[in-house]
Regions:
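ATP/NTP phosphate-donor binding region
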Residues: 1-99
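C-terminal charged capping/lid subdomain of soluble metabolic enzymes
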Residues: 184-187, 279-353
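Short glycine/serine/threonine-rich phosphate/pyrophosphate-binding segments
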Residues: 107-114, 135-136, 247
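Generic secondary-structure signature for well-ordered alpha-helical cores
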Residues: 151, 160-164, 169-176, 184-196, ...
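A glycine/threonine-rich phosphate-anchoring loop and its flanking beta-alpha core
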Residues: 15, 114-204
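Non-catalytic interfacial helical region
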Residues: 86-103, 112-127
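Active-site segments that bind and position negatively charged phosphate/pyrophosphate groups
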Residues: 199-306
Length: 353
Protein backbone atom coordinates (compact mmCIF):
# COMPACT_ATOMS: atom_id res chain seq x y z
CA UNK A 1 0.00 0.00 0.00
CA UNK A 2 1.18 3.51 -0.85
CA UNK A 3 0.56 6.12 1.84
CA UNK A 4 0.87 9.86 1.21
CA UNK A 5 0.50 12.06 4.29
CA UNK A 6 -1.11 15.46 3.74
CA UNK A 7 -0.37 18.27 6.19
CA UNK A 8 -3.14 20.86 6.40
CA UNK A 9 -5.60 22.32 8.91
CA UNK A 10 -6.61 18.68 9.33
CA UNK A 11 -3.83 16.19 8.60
CA UNK A 12 -4.80 12.99 6.82
CA UNK A 13 -3.49 10.12 4.75
CA UNK A 14 -4.15 9.19 1.14
CA UNK A 15 -4.00 5.41 0.77
CA UNK A 16 -3.56 3.84 -2.67
CA UNK A 17 -3.93 0.08 -3.12
CA UNK A 18 -5.81 -2.28 -5.44
CA UNK A 19 -8.69 -3.95 -3.61
CA UNK A 20 -8.87 -1.21 -0.98
CA UNK A 21 -12.62 -0.70 -1.48
CA UNK A 22 -13.41 -3.95 0.34
CA UNK A 23 -11.22 -2.88 3.26
CA UNK A 24 -12.61 0.66 3.42
CA UNK A 25 -14.68 0.07 6.55
CA UNK A 26 -11.70 -1.16 8.55
CA UNK A 27 -9.52 1.71 7.32
CA UNK A 28 -12.16 4.30 8.24
CA UNK A 29 -12.73 2.70 11.64
CA UNK A 30 -8.99 2.87 12.31
CA UNK A 31 -9.05 6.65 11.79
CA UNK A 32 -12.49 7.66 13.09
CA UNK A 33 -13.64 4.81 15.28
CA UNK A 34 -16.68 2.63 14.69
CA UNK A 35 -20.31 2.50 15.83
CA UNK A 36 -21.24 5.53 13.73
CA UNK A 37 -23.61 6.13 10.84
CA UNK A 38 -21.83 6.46 7.51
CA UNK A 39 -23.77 8.21 4.75
CA UNK A 40 -22.47 7.12 1.35
CA UNK A 41 -22.96 9.76 -1.36
CA UNK A 42 -22.77 8.46 -4.94
CA UNK A 43 -24.03 9.13 -8.42
CA UNK A 44 -26.44 6.56 -9.78
CA UNK A 45 -23.93 4.77 -12.02
CA UNK A 46 -21.22 4.54 -9.37
CA UNK A 47 -23.78 3.49 -6.75
CA UNK A 48 -24.82 0.59 -8.96
CA UNK A 49 -21.22 -0.52 -9.35
CA UNK A 50 -19.69 0.02 -5.92
CA UNK A 51 -22.05 1.31 -3.21
CA UNK A 52 -23.10 -2.20 -2.19
CA UNK A 53 -19.51 -3.33 -1.69
CA UNK A 54 -18.64 -0.19 0.24
CA UNK A 55 -21.74 -0.50 2.44
CA UNK A 56 -20.90 -4.14 3.16
CA UNK A 57 -17.37 -3.19 4.14
CA UNK A 58 -18.67 -0.46 6.44
CA UNK A 59 -21.21 -2.82 8.01
CA UNK A 60 -18.52 -5.43 8.69
CA UNK A 61 -16.52 -2.75 10.49
CA UNK A 62 -19.46 -1.84 12.74
CA UNK A 63 -20.94 1.16 10.93
CA UNK A 64 -24.59 1.74 10.01
CA UNK A 65 -24.47 2.49 6.29
CA UNK A 66 -27.07 4.54 4.41
CA UNK A 67 -26.79 5.67 0.79
CA UNK A 68 -27.80 8.91 -0.95
CA UNK A 69 -27.86 8.68 -4.74
CA UNK A 70 -28.33 11.41 -7.33
CA UNK A 71 -27.92 11.52 -11.13
CA UNK A 72 -24.22 12.28 -10.79
CA UNK A 73 -23.58 14.88 -13.48
CA UNK A 74 -22.13 18.39 -13.32
CA UNK A 75 -25.67 19.66 -13.96
CA UNK A 76 -26.65 18.23 -10.57
CA UNK A 77 -23.89 19.96 -8.57
CA UNK A 78 -26.41 22.56 -7.48
CA UNK A 79 -27.87 24.14 -4.37
CA UNK A 80 -30.99 22.02 -4.94
CA UNK A 81 -29.04 18.74 -4.82
CA UNK A 82 -27.05 20.03 -1.86
CA UNK A 83 -30.31 20.81 -0.02
CA UNK A 84 -31.68 17.35 -0.84
CA UNK A 85 -28.53 15.78 0.60
CA UNK A 86 -28.82 17.83 3.79
CA UNK A 87 -32.46 16.75 4.15
CA UNK A 88 -31.36 13.12 3.68
CA UNK A 89 -28.75 13.45 6.43
CA UNK A 90 -31.30 14.99 8.78
CA UNK A 91 -33.93 12.35 7.96
CA UNK A 92 -31.44 9.63 8.88
CA UNK A 93 -30.58 11.53 12.06
CA UNK A 94 -26.88 11.90 11.40
CA UNK A 95 -25.09 13.76 14.16
CA UNK A 96 -21.71 15.45 14.35
CA UNK A 97 -20.18 12.15 15.43
CA UNK A 98 -21.27 10.47 12.18
CA UNK A 99 -19.65 10.79 8.75
CA UNK A 100 -20.12 11.17 5.02
CA UNK A 101 -18.30 8.98 2.50
CA UNK A 102 -17.95 10.47 -0.99
CA UNK A 103 -17.91 7.57 -3.47
CA UNK A 104 -17.27 8.72 -7.04
CA UNK A 105 -15.64 11.46 -9.04
CA UNK A 106 -15.02 15.15 -8.60
CA UNK A 107 -18.67 16.21 -8.69
CA UNK A 108 -19.58 13.82 -5.89
CA UNK A 109 -16.55 14.82 -3.85
CA UNK A 110 -17.38 18.52 -4.20
CA UNK A 111 -21.03 18.01 -3.27
CA UNK A 112 -20.45 15.60 -0.38
CA UNK A 113 -17.57 17.65 0.98
CA UNK A 114 -19.60 20.86 1.01
CA UNK A 115 -22.45 19.07 2.79
CA UNK A 116 -20.00 17.64 5.33
CA UNK A 117 -18.49 21.07 5.93
CA UNK A 118 -21.83 22.71 6.63
CA UNK A 119 -24.17 20.06 8.07
CA UNK A 120 -24.37 20.72 11.81
CA UNK A 121 -21.37 23.04 11.34
CA UNK A 122 -19.17 20.20 10.13
CA UNK A 123 -19.01 16.41 10.29
CA UNK A 124 -16.16 14.12 9.20
CA UNK A 125 -15.98 12.93 5.64
CA UNK A 126 -13.93 10.44 3.68
CA UNK A 127 -13.11 10.54 -0.02
CA UNK A 128 -13.28 7.29 -2.02
CA UNK A 129 -12.46 8.41 -5.58
CA UNK A 130 -13.54 6.14 -8.43
CA UNK A 131 -12.38 8.29 -11.36
CA UNK A 132 -8.83 9.03 -12.44
CA UNK A 133 -9.51 12.77 -12.21
CA UNK A 134 -10.67 12.52 -8.61
CA UNK A 135 -7.88 10.13 -7.66
CA UNK A 136 -5.07 12.36 -8.92
CA UNK A 137 -6.56 15.74 -8.07
CA UNK A 138 -9.96 16.67 -6.68
CA UNK A 139 -10.14 14.20 -3.76
CA UNK A 140 -7.10 15.82 -2.15
CA UNK A 141 -6.77 19.38 -0.89
CA UNK A 142 -10.10 20.20 0.71
CA UNK A 143 -11.86 22.27 -1.96
CA UNK A 144 -15.63 21.75 -1.84
CA UNK A 145 -18.32 23.58 -3.79
CA UNK A 146 -21.52 23.64 -5.79
CA UNK A 147 -22.30 25.60 -8.94
CA UNK A 148 -24.53 28.59 -9.59
CA UNK A 149 -26.08 29.62 -12.90
CA UNK A 150 -23.28 32.19 -13.16
CA UNK A 151 -20.50 29.61 -13.11
CA UNK A 152 -18.70 26.66 -11.55
CA UNK A 153 -17.88 26.32 -7.87
CA UNK A 154 -19.32 29.71 -6.92
CA UNK A 155 -20.48 28.52 -3.47
CA UNK A 156 -18.07 26.48 -1.40
CA UNK A 157 -15.38 26.32 1.24
CA UNK A 158 -12.14 24.62 2.21
CA UNK A 159 -12.80 21.49 4.27
CA UNK A 160 -10.24 18.72 4.47
CA UNK A 161 -11.28 15.06 4.49
CA UNK A 162 -10.30 12.76 7.34
CA UNK A 163 -9.04 10.09 4.94
CA UNK A 164 -8.75 9.38 1.21
CA UNK A 165 -9.01 5.77 0.04
CA UNK A 166 -8.06 5.15 -3.58
CA UNK A 167 -8.62 1.70 -5.09
CA UNK A 168 -7.18 1.74 -8.63
CA UNK A 169 -9.28 -1.31 -9.49
CA UNK A 170 -12.37 0.93 -9.59
CA UNK A 171 -10.87 2.80 -12.54
CA UNK A 172 -11.30 -0.29 -14.72
CA UNK A 173 -15.01 0.45 -15.15
CA UNK A 174 -14.45 4.02 -16.35
CA UNK A 175 -15.65 4.75 -19.88
CA UNK A 176 -12.72 5.69 -22.15
CA UNK A 177 -13.84 9.32 -22.34
CA UNK A 178 -13.88 9.61 -18.54
CA UNK A 179 -10.41 8.09 -18.32
CA UNK A 180 -9.20 10.70 -20.82
CA UNK A 181 -10.64 13.43 -18.61
CA UNK A 182 -8.39 12.28 -15.79
CA UNK A 183 -5.39 12.19 -18.10
CA UNK A 184 -5.79 15.94 -18.65
CA UNK A 185 -5.21 16.57 -14.94
CA UNK A 186 -2.24 14.17 -14.97
CA UNK A 187 -0.67 16.10 -17.85
CA UNK A 188 -1.33 19.32 -15.94
CA UNK A 189 0.85 18.09 -13.07
CA UNK A 190 3.66 17.14 -15.43
CA UNK A 191 3.61 20.55 -17.13
CA UNK A 192 3.56 22.25 -13.74
CA UNK A 193 6.16 20.34 -11.80
CA UNK A 194 8.19 17.66 -13.58
CA UNK A 195 9.82 17.27 -16.98
CA UNK A 196 10.82 13.64 -16.16
CA UNK A 197 7.17 12.84 -15.35
CA UNK A 198 6.14 14.50 -18.63
CA UNK A 199 8.60 12.25 -20.48
CA UNK A 200 7.26 9.20 -18.65
CA UNK A 201 3.74 10.03 -19.82
CA UNK A 202 5.00 10.27 -23.40
CA UNK A 203 6.80 6.95 -23.15
CA UNK A 204 4.13 4.85 -21.45
CA UNK A 205 0.35 5.31 -21.13
CA UNK A 206 -1.16 6.28 -17.81
CA UNK A 207 -3.09 3.00 -17.70
CA UNK A 208 0.17 1.03 -17.64
CA UNK A 209 1.53 2.95 -14.62
CA UNK A 210 -1.62 4.09 -12.87
CA UNK A 211 -0.58 3.51 -9.24
CA UNK A 212 2.67 5.40 -9.81
CA UNK A 213 0.79 8.18 -11.61
CA UNK A 214 -1.72 8.59 -8.77
CA UNK A 215 1.00 8.65 -6.12
CA UNK A 216 3.11 11.12 -8.12
CA UNK A 217 0.25 13.57 -8.72
CA UNK A 218 -1.01 13.35 -5.14
CA UNK A 219 2.52 13.94 -3.87
CA UNK A 220 2.83 17.08 -5.99
CA UNK A 221 -0.54 18.38 -4.82
CA UNK A 222 0.32 17.52 -1.20
CA UNK A 223 3.37 19.78 -1.39
CA UNK A 224 1.41 22.71 -2.84
CA UNK A 225 -1.41 22.32 -0.30
CA UNK A 226 1.06 22.18 2.59
CA UNK A 227 2.61 25.45 1.43
CA UNK A 228 -0.66 27.26 0.65
CA UNK A 229 -3.77 25.46 1.89
CA UNK A 230 -6.18 28.30 1.23
CA UNK A 231 -5.18 29.10 -2.35
CA UNK A 232 -3.67 32.54 -1.83
CA UNK A 233 -0.30 31.93 -3.49
CA UNK A 234 1.56 28.95 -4.92
CA UNK A 235 -1.45 26.61 -4.80
CA UNK A 236 -2.99 28.71 -7.56
CA UNK A 237 -0.54 26.98 -9.89
CA UNK A 238 -2.94 24.02 -9.78
CA UNK A 239 -5.33 26.15 -11.85
CA UNK A 240 -3.24 25.63 -15.00
CA UNK A 241 -5.77 25.39 -17.83
CA UNK A 242 -8.70 26.02 -15.52
CA UNK A 243 -9.63 29.67 -16.09
CA UNK A 244 -10.21 29.27 -19.81
CA UNK A 245 -11.18 25.62 -19.32
CA UNK A 246 -14.03 26.57 -16.99
CA UNK A 247 -15.12 29.16 -19.55
CA UNK A 248 -15.32 26.44 -22.21
CA UNK A 249 -17.33 24.23 -19.85
CA UNK A 250 -19.75 27.05 -19.07
CA UNK A 251 -20.20 27.99 -22.73
CA UNK A 252 -21.07 24.37 -23.52
CA UNK A 253 -23.60 24.24 -20.66
CA UNK A 254 -21.27 21.57 -19.24
CA UNK A 255 -21.56 19.29 -22.26
CA UNK A 256 -17.74 19.62 -22.38
CA UNK A 257 -16.51 17.67 -19.33
CA UNK A 258 -14.00 19.12 -16.91
CA UNK A 259 -10.93 17.25 -18.15
CA UNK A 260 -11.57 18.23 -21.76
CA UNK A 261 -12.11 21.82 -20.66
CA UNK A 262 -8.79 21.79 -18.82
CA UNK A 263 -7.06 20.33 -21.89
CA UNK A 264 -8.44 23.09 -24.11
CA UNK A 265 -7.51 25.67 -21.49
CA UNK A 266 -3.94 24.36 -21.34
CA UNK A 267 -3.71 24.46 -25.13
CA UNK A 268 -4.95 28.07 -25.25
CA UNK A 269 -2.53 29.25 -22.59
CA UNK A 270 0.40 27.34 -24.12
CA UNK A 271 -0.18 28.99 -27.50
CA UNK A 272 -0.55 32.40 -25.86
CA UNK A 273 2.62 31.89 -23.81
CA UNK A 274 4.58 30.96 -26.93
CA UNK A 275 3.26 33.94 -28.87
CA UNK A 276 4.20 36.28 -26.01
CA UNK A 277 7.68 34.79 -25.66
CA UNK A 278 7.05 33.35 -22.19
CA UNK A 279 7.78 29.82 -23.40
CA UNK A 280 9.36 28.51 -26.57
CA UNK A 281 7.43 27.26 -29.56
CA UNK A 282 8.89 23.82 -28.80
CA UNK A 283 7.46 23.83 -25.27
CA UNK A 284 4.05 24.74 -26.67
CA UNK A 285 4.32 22.02 -29.32
CA UNK A 286 5.25 19.41 -26.70
CA UNK A 287 2.22 20.28 -24.55
CA UNK A 288 -0.16 20.15 -27.52
CA UNK A 289 1.36 16.88 -28.74
CA UNK A 290 0.95 15.14 -25.37
CA UNK A 291 -2.65 16.29 -25.04
CA UNK A 292 -3.38 14.91 -28.51
CA UNK A 293 -1.48 11.70 -27.73
CA UNK A 294 -4.06 11.05 -25.00
CA UNK A 295 -6.99 11.88 -27.28
CA UNK A 296 -7.73 15.20 -25.62
CA UNK A 297 -9.06 18.28 -27.47
CA UNK A 298 -6.85 21.31 -28.06
CA UNK A 299 -9.34 23.50 -29.94
CA UNK A 300 -12.80 24.93 -29.33
CA UNK A 301 -15.45 26.41 -31.59
CA UNK A 302 -16.55 28.94 -28.98
CA UNK A 303 -15.78 32.52 -29.90
CA UNK A 304 -13.49 34.94 -28.13
CA UNK A 305 -16.48 37.04 -27.06
CA UNK A 306 -18.31 34.06 -25.57
CA UNK A 307 -15.25 32.80 -23.69
CA UNK A 308 -14.42 36.30 -22.46
CA UNK A 309 -17.91 36.72 -21.05
CA UNK A 310 -17.70 33.34 -19.30
CA UNK A 311 -14.20 33.98 -17.97
CA UNK A 312 -15.28 37.29 -16.42
CA UNK A 313 -17.43 35.26 -14.00
CA UNK A 314 -14.47 33.14 -12.90
CA UNK A 315 -14.08 32.98 -9.12
CA UNK A 316 -10.33 33.47 -9.58
CA UNK A 317 -10.89 37.13 -10.52
CA UNK A 318 -9.91 39.44 -7.65
CA UNK A 319 -9.55 43.22 -7.72
CA UNK A 320 -10.47 43.19 -11.38
CA UNK A 321 -7.62 40.82 -12.27
CA UNK A 322 -7.62 37.20 -13.40
CA UNK A 323 -4.92 34.83 -12.22
CA UNK A 324 -3.60 32.95 -15.25
CA UNK A 325 -1.14 30.08 -14.89
CA UNK A 326 1.35 30.28 -17.74
CA UNK A 327 4.00 27.70 -18.74
CA UNK A 328 7.62 28.85 -18.97
CA UNK A 329 8.97 25.40 -19.77
CA UNK A 330 7.96 21.80 -19.10
CA UNK A 331 7.98 21.45 -15.32
CA UNK A 332 7.81 25.17 -14.54
CA UNK A 333 4.89 27.62 -14.67
CA UNK A 334 4.23 31.07 -13.26
CA UNK A 335 1.25 33.08 -12.11
CA UNK A 336 0.28 36.06 -14.29
CA UNK A 337 -2.23 38.53 -12.86
CA UNK A 338 -3.92 40.13 -15.86
CA UNK A 339 -6.59 42.85 -15.93
CA UNK A 340 -9.96 41.42 -16.92
CA UNK A 341 -9.87 43.82 -19.87
CA UNK A 342 -6.89 41.86 -21.25
CA UNK A 343 -8.72 38.51 -21.39
CA UNK A 344 -9.69 38.92 -25.09
CA UNK A 345 -6.06 39.60 -26.08
CA UNK A 346 -4.82 36.48 -24.28
CA UNK A 347 -7.54 34.41 -25.93
CA UNK A 348 -6.59 35.85 -29.32
CA UNK A 349 -2.94 34.93 -28.74
CA UNK A 350 -4.17 31.48 -27.74
CA UNK A 351 -5.74 30.99 -31.15
CA UNK A 352 -9.35 31.91 -30.35
CA UNK A 353 -11.06 33.91 -33.08
Amino acid sequence: MTTIHVTASRDYDVLVQPGLLDDAGAQIAHVLGTGRTAAIVAGETVAGLYAGRLAASLTRAGFRAVTFTYPGSEHCKTLATYAALLDFLAAHRLSRSDLIVALGGGVTGDLAGFAAATYQRGIPFVQVPTTLLAAVDSSVGGKTAVNLASGKNQVGCFYQPSLVLCDPDTLRTLPPEEYRNGCAEVIKYAVLRSAPFFDALRAEPVSAQVEHVIATCVGMKRDLVAADEFDRGSRQLLNLGHSFGHAVEKCSDYAVPHGCGVAIGMAIIARAAAKRGICTDDTCAQILALLRQYGLPTETAFTRDALTDAARSDKKIADGKLHLIVPERIGRCRIEMIPAADIPAWLADGGIA
